[in-house]
From Swiss-Prot:
It comes from Corynebacterium glutamicum (strain ATCC 13032 / DSM 20300 / JCM 1318 / BCRC 11384 / CCUG 27702 / LMG 3730 / NBRC 12168 / NCIMB 10025 / NRRL B-2784 / 534). InterPro entries: ThiC (IPR037509), ThiC-associated_dom (IPR025747), ThiC/Bza_core_dom (IPR038521), ThiC/BzaA/B (IPR002817). Catalyzes the synthesis of the hydroxymethylpyrimidine phosphate (HMP-P) moiety of thiamine from aminoimidazole ribotide (AIR) in a radical S-adenosyl-L-methionine (SAM)-dependent reaction. Coiled coil: none annotated. Zn(2+) binds at residues 378, 442. This is Phosphomethylpyrimidine synthase. [4Fe-4S] cluster binds at residues 522, 525, 530. The keyword Transcription regulation does not apply. Binds 1 [4Fe-4S] cluster per subunit. The cluster is coordinated with 3 cysteines and an exchangeable S-adenosyl-L-methionine. The gene is thiC. Its EC number is 4.1.99.17.
Length: 587
């Protein structure tokens, strides 16, 4: 693996964990010395992958692991069709920017084999992917295997996406975040979407979903997968709809199955399938304030009503499982009836679908297919935990993957914040992955800056949840920042920040000179009113006396201060302070 040169801060460097032939990426942050001595470098999780030319794609990290197991083979694959790139490509006669990098023949399981991480885990096999994840999460590989075997965690790694660096989604591991990218019929290009992918993973996206609905759907996805170090998810019904000229009623199993296989062969790692939208549940949405807000959910609801039968996704679910088991594609069982407003939260339609999704989860597990369950949406704070509890009950602890939820509907332009509040809350209660929301939610297609804002905001929510859950090592990052802050190590504060660029920019707006990077104050309070500087001065002036007096620690109820010796000592210091002019900073 080639180290990335373009780090987000000069104190950052690529510093992998190397063990048993594996090279697991981490970022090392070099810290300055404290007054009391040197600080060890701080290490953080890294998602960005190696530096590469987007026209060539990433190294095929997992290729040898996959083929060494001896249970897959290459085959010719389906014929590439122009309609795969949508109606605009049909009119032009070609895709706008064909992928010309490496594209080996696709792999799939040999007859009678299932090549999923769940199948291996249930057979007692610890794969290289599991070993990689264990090093990345700083846990035992057997623990990883057991969680995957039970369905409580997934490692989404299609055999046709060998460029991906294994990661795990489960509530006993670090909370992960997903970033959505993808073009629309109105805007964006292949180059822009690849740039968004690289930008999202640079700032910490653990997975990326390509939700393209516009031009060059197939080709855009090819560029994204070949350049992605993280798992790629899709909602295949979007592309299938494009193949039938956008008419939901004209969709059928044959078109959808062909689209699924197309995406499996390309290397999509997980797919959102709205198989829980049943005909009987649609009338339950009629009294809602915002109806059905999921694009996939509305497409399938329209199809069910047009044909007055259960969807082909539900009727052919077992065949979907068989296909996914041949490529190790994970289900992301979509919540097509999720609430789109607080008024509709936790209603009969939402929970009826969730219960069906739980049943589908068990069916997928019969085929050793990995599953995560999608969740809301828009939910008031006081109603969030019920979603965790019912998902864990009905879906047997399969990883929960939620969009927020947004906890208020009054802040267009700030929905990254309204949703991050709910995201931190629901992740604290057990949700394994959070789908980011950008400031453009409900308003427009996010650009590169919006992607960064969404990722940073959701990294905050995920980390806050990990701290609250007591995840091993989570608070160490906060403690390192707090120590740097108290010691006025400004450059270390910037380096330890989720977004060093913004931290530096805000600091330098008022104190741009280089000496300000070592000053014992900031522009908020100035030099005379900085609480941390005053606290440091108190330690410097009275530290020995405080230690001698046996000042109690936090929660120490023995109250050594109450002793007569302590009272006399404090009185003496009080007289000295007043006699000296009663100034904290003596001139």
């Amino acid at each position: 693996m080639t180290p990335t040169q373009n780090e987000i801060h000069p104190k950052h460097s690529y510093s992998p964990i190397r063990k048993d032939g594996l090279e697991v990426p981490e970022t090392e942050i070099r810290l300055d010395d404290s007054p009391s001595g040197p600080n060890e470098p701080f290490r953080i999780y890294r998602t960005r992958g190696p530096e590469t030319n987007p026209k060539q794609g990433l190294p095929r990290l997992r290729e040898s692991w996959i083929t060494a197991r001896g249970d897959v083979a290459t085959y010719q694959g389906r014929e590439r069709l122009l309609i795969d790139d949508g109606r605009s490509a049909m009119r032009r006669g070609q895709a706008s920017a064909e992928w010309k990098g490496q594209k080996p023949a696709p792999l799939k399981a040999l007859p009678g084999k299932r090549v999923t991480q769940m199948a291996y885990a249930r057979a007692g096999v610890i794969t290289r992917e599991m070993e990689f994840v264990a090093l990345r999460e700083h846990v035992d590989a057997e623990f990883v295997r057991s969680e995957v075997a039970r369905g409580r965690a997934i490692i989404p790694n299609n055999v046709n996406h060998p460029e991906s660096e294994p990661m795990i989604i489960g509530r006993k591991f670090l909370t992960k975040i997903n970033a959505n990218i993808g073009n629309s019929a109105v805007t964006s290009s292949i180059e822009e979407e690849v740039s968004k992918l690289q930008w999202a993973t640079r700032w910490g996206a653990d997975t990326v979903m390509d939700l393209s609905t516009g031009d060059d759907i197939h080709t855009t996805r090819e560029w994204i997968i070949r350049n992605s170090p993280v798992p790629i998810g899709t909602v295949p019904i979007y592309q299938a709809l494009e193949k039938v000229n956008g008419v939901a009623a004209d969709l059928n199993w044959e078109v959808f199955r062909d689209t699924i296989i197309e995406q499996c062969e390309q290397g999509v790692d997980y797919m959102t399938i709205h198989a829980g939208v049943l005909l009987a549940y649609i009338p339950l949405t009629t009294r809602r304030v915002t109806g059905i807000v999921s694009r996939g959910g509305s497409i399938m609801a329209g199809w069910c009503l047009a044909h007055h039968r259960e969807s082909f996704l539900y009727e052919h679910f077992d065949e979907l499982c068989e296909i996914f088991a041949q490529y190790d594609v994970a289900f992301s069982l979509g919540d097509g009836l999720r609430p789109g407003s607080l008024a509709d939260a936790n209603d009969a339609a939402q929970f009826a679908e969730l219960k069906t999704i739980g049943e589908l989860t068990q069916r997928a597990w019969e085929y050793d297919v990995q599953v995560m369950v999608e969740g809301p949406g828009h939910v008031p704070l006081n109603m969030i935990q019920e979603n965790n509890e019912l998902e864990q009950k009905w879906a047997a602890d399969a990883p929960f993957y939620t969009l927020g939820p947004l906890v208020t509907d009054i802040a267009p332009g700030y929905d990254h914040i309204t949703s991050a509040i709910g995201a931190a809350h629901i992740a604290m209660g057990g949700t394994a992955m959070l789908c980011y929301v950008t400031p453009k939610e409900h308003l427009g297609l996010p650009n590169r800056d919006d992607v960064k804002t969404g990722v940073i905001t959701y990294k905050l929510a995920a980390h806050a949840a990990d701290v609250a859950k007591g995840h091993p090592g989570a608070r160490a990052w906060d403690d390192a920042m707090s120590k740097a802050r108290f010691e006025f190590r400004w450059n270390d504060q910037f380096a330890l920040s989720l977004d060093p660029d913004t931290a530096i920019a805000y600091h330098d707006e008022t104190l741009p000179a280089e000496p300000a990077k070592t000053a014992h104050f900031c522009s908020m309070c100035g030099p005379k009113f900085c609480s941390m500087r005053i606290s440091q001065d108190i330690r410097d002036m009275f530290g020995d006396q405080i230690a001698e007096l046996g000042m109690p620690g936090v929660g120490d109820s023995s109250s050594a201060v109450a002793s007569s010796g302590a009272r006399e000592g404090m009185a003496e210091k009080s007289r000295e302070f007043i006699a000296g002019g009663a100034e904290v900073y003596r001139r």
